[in-house]
């Protein structure tokens, strides 16, 4: 019998119930997926920078951060900044959430796969998207050189951002013109990594599920 894969769900504090509901151990009547017997660790984004204390019944001081097969990051745009901690006058450095996630969870221990969930992956510019994708690649800029023909993620998204910036400054701009000017590799990246679901799409194709779990406000 194969051992169960170790999975971590990272989410904002306010979304805790969205995830713990589907844990089989809680045996919740609201769990429509109870037969799947889901088991995973649920933590907050802020728990990444806590070395002690509890989250639910989890002792943060005893977590083996490098032992997760899968990390699901809800509201992943909260990790759009790739800031790293700075040393103080005593030479000590406190890791940022981004640094803790990429260094201690994704790059340490076993091979970790990452799933990002976000309705707004880009807040400022395409560097937001780049930094989130780096969580998937463990910071490797050339990770898609063979699979998608993208030798440098950073270079591609910078080039794409430059095209968008110039296009946005034109008064009579149209979206078709932008699409024709963006690098073809940009669309290869989106096709290879993303699954997009709009509210309209969900309401049309997942009506039965919405009837069970609740509709959009």
Language model regions located:
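Conserved Walker A/P-loop ATP-binding site and its immediately adjacent core
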Residues: 1-25, 121-129
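Post-Walker A helix-loop "phosphate-sensing" segment adjacent to the P-loop in P-loop NTPases
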Residues: 2-4, 136-141
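Conserved nucleic-acid-binding Ia/Ib motif block in the N-terminal RecA-like helicase ATPase lobe
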Residues: 17-42
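CheY-like receiver
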Residues: 21, 131-134, 155
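Inter-lobe coupling linker of SF2 helicases/translocases
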Residues: 37-79, 83-121, 128, 138-217
């Amino acid at each position: 019998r194969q051992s169960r894969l170790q999975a971590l769900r990272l989410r904002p504090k306010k979304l805790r119930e969205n995830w713990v509901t589907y844990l089989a151990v809680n045996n919740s009547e609201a769990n429509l997926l109870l037969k799947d017997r889901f088991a995973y660790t649920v933590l907050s984004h802020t728990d990444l920078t806590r070395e002690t204390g509890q989250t639910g019944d989890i002792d943060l001081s005893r977590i083996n951060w490098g032992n997760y097969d899968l990390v699901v990051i809800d509201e992943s745009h909260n990790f759009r900044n790739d800031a790293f901690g700075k040393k103080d006058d005593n030479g000590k450095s406190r890791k940022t959430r981004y640094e803790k996630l990429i260094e201690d969870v994704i790059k340490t221990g076993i091979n970790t796969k990452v799933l990002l969930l976000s309705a707004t992956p880009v807040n400022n510019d395409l560097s937001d998207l780049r930094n989130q994708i780096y969580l998937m690649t463990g910071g490797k800029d050339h990770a898609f050189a063979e699979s998608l023909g993208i030798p440098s993620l950073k270079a591609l998204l910078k080039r794409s951002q430059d095209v968008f910036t110039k296009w946005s400054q034109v008064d009579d701009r149209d979206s078709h013109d932008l699409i024709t000017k963006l690098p073809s590799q940009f669309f290869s990246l989106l096709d290879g990594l993303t699954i997009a679901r709009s509210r309209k799409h969900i309401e049309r194709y997942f009506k039965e599920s919405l009837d069970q779990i609740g509709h959009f406000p």
